[in-house]
From Swiss-Prot:
<dbReference type="GO" id="GO:0071555">
    <property type="term" value="P:cell wall organization"/>
</dbReference>
<feature type="binding site">
    <location>
        <position position="127"/>
    </location>
    <ligand>
        <name>UDP-N-acetyl-alpha-D-glucosamine</name>
    </ligand>
</feature>
<keyword id="KW-0808">Transferase</keyword>
<feature type="binding site">
    <location>
        <position position="163"/>
    </location>
    <ligand>
        <name>UDP-N-acetyl-alpha-D-glucosamine</name>
    </ligand>
</feature>
<keyword id="KW-0472">Membrane</keyword>
<keyword id="KW-0961">Cell wall biogenesis/degradation</keyword>
<keyword id="KW-1003">Cell membrane</keyword>
<keyword id="KW-0328">Glycosyltransferase</keyword>
<feature type="binding site">
    <location>
        <position position="244"/>
    </location>
    <ligand>
        <name>UDP-N-acetyl-alpha-D-glucosamine</name>
    </ligand>
</feature>
<dbReference type="GO" id="GO:0005975">
    <property type="term" value="P:carbohydrate metabolic process"/>
</dbReference>
<protein>
    <recommendedName>
        <fullName>UDP-N-acetylglucosamine--N-acetylmuramyl-(pentapeptide) pyrophosphoryl-undecaprenol N-acetylglucosamine transferase</fullName>
        <ecNumber>2.4.1.227</ecNumber>
    </recommendedName>
</protein>
<dbReference type="GO" id="GO:0005886">
    <property type="term" value="C:plasma membrane"/>
</dbReference>
<feature type="binding site">
    <location>
        <begin position="263"/>
        <end position="268"/>
    </location>
    <ligand>
        <name>UDP-N-acetyl-alpha-D-glucosamine</name>
    </ligand>
</feature>
<comment type="function">
    <text>Cell wall formation. Catalyzes the transfer of a GlcNAc subunit on undecaprenyl-pyrophosphoryl-MurNAc-pentapeptide (lipid intermediate I) to form undecaprenyl-pyrophosphoryl-MurNAc-(pentapeptide)GlcNAc (lipid intermediate II).</text>
</comment>
<feature type="binding site">
    <location>
        <begin position="15"/>
        <end position="17"/>
    </location>
    <ligand>
        <name>UDP-N-acetyl-alpha-D-glucosamine</name>
    </ligand>
</feature>
<dbReference type="GO" id="GO:0050511">
    <property type="term" value="F:undecaprenyldiphospho-muramoylpentapeptide beta-N-acetylglucosaminyltransferase activity"/>
</dbReference>
<keyword id="KW-0997">Cell inner membrane</keyword>
Length: 355
């Protein structure tokens, strides 16, 4: 049996912030000869995305409990029990040597099933404040890791696994050397866009005139509206796209980013070495604020809570940053990044796997 490849089951679903780091670790271990399967749900993004990466996926039926009403809460124990039974049956068939929980509702029943079968459970928390599933699973996990300090008091800080093309970008002092002309501002609202960015940044452009050039990802279905907003204030020259397929190229182009502060976005911006203005999405638990705080504390970014994200405040901030200041911020961002996060997570998975 010693010649058999090790087996990993990745448990992650729902959003790219959970799925993409899991894929990075999966590919790293597959390159070392590991067999990897995925545990997810059939109605979320992992169902389509994971098979495209050459990884087989098994599904269980589970969804979130927040905001579902009294009936859903009363039915929750039965739903969780059924999902646990499904996950347990899947793991009995695949016989993983270790499971890796990257977040999302699927990790709860999956982690409990693995624990009940004596399979080591490794958790990775991507956000600066722990999600409910990981808070609960941490009590039974073999190892807990975190991307940012503070999610768990005693967990090792390992960063977030990010895409290799972002990690391959030249260092800020190389990439930004010799640049002049207008400051290049990359505006990213995530794949869904962000209304506050779409409404505010054209007005900022009007204030700053030819001192900036903007590349603005608007999100789905509103590209024309945002283009009209720029044109309406006499700034039609700025580039508006619905999506940006090659984020590494966009980061390489930019001098500064204006964006939400999802966990992966923050980690990618740090890895690329870019200054940022972060506008945290207003979650109840302020998850995105806590993600961005380490970069602000390092002098690499400025956080504007949404009510403070005004035309005047943003325009004044951007106007106040010289190229020299932006380079210093970029170097600080890169200095606090953890570029070997994928290797750190994979190493821990290997360490605790059953022999």
């Amino acid at each position: 049996m010693s010649g058999q490849p090790k087996r990993l089951m990745v448990m992650a679903g729902g959003t790219g912030g959970h799925v993409f780091p899991g894929l990075a670790v999966a590919h790293h271990l597959m390159a070392q000869g590991w067999q990897v399967r995925w545990l997810g749900t059939a109605d979320r993004m992992e169902a389509d995305l994971v098979p495209k990466h050459g990884i087989d996926i098994d599904f269980i039926r589970i969804s979130g409990l927040r905001g579902k009403g009294v009936k859903a809460l009363l039915a929750a124990p039965l739903r969780i029990f059924n999902a646990w039974r499904q996950a347990r049956a899947i793991m009995k068939r695949f016989k993983p040597d270790v499971v890796l929980g990257m977040g999302g509702y699927v990790s709860g029943p999956g982690g409990l099933a693995a624990w009940s079968l004596g399979i080591p459970v490794v958790l990775h928390e991507q956000n600066g404040i722990a999600g409910l599933t990981n808070q609960w699973l941490a009590k039974i996990a073999t190892t807990v890791m975190q991307a940012f300090p503070g999610a768990f008091p005693n967990a090792e800080v390992v960063g977030n696994p990010v895409r290799t093309d972002v990690l391959a970008l030249p260092l800020p002092q190389v990439r930004l050397a010799g640049r002049d002309g207008p400051i290049r501002v990359l505006v990213v609202g995530g794949s869904q866009g962000a209304r506050v960015l779409n409404q505010t940044m054209p007005q900022v452009a009007a204030r700053l005139g030819d001192t900036v050039t903007i590349w603005h990802q608007s999100g789905k279905g509103v590209q024309h509206t945002v283009e009209q907003a720029y044109a309406g204030v006499g700034q039609p020259q700025h580039k508006v796209t619905e999506f940006i397929d090659d984020m590494a190229a966009a980061y390489a182009w930019a001098d500064v980013v204006v964006c939400r502060s999802g966990a992966l976005t923050v980690s990618e911006i740090a890895a690329a070495g870019l200054p940022a203005i972060f506008v945290p999405f207003q979650h109840k638990d302020r998850q995105q604020y806590w993600n961005a705080l380490p970069l602000e504390n390092a002098g690499a970014a400025k956080i504007f809570e949404q009510p403070q994200f005004t035309v005047e405040a943003v325009a004044d901030t951007l106007a106040g940053w010289s190229r020299g200041a932006l380079l210093t911020m970029a170097e600080r961002a890169r200095a606090v990044s953890i570029p070997d996060a994928t290797e750190r997570v994979a190493s821990e998975v290997s360490r605790v796997a059953r022999t």
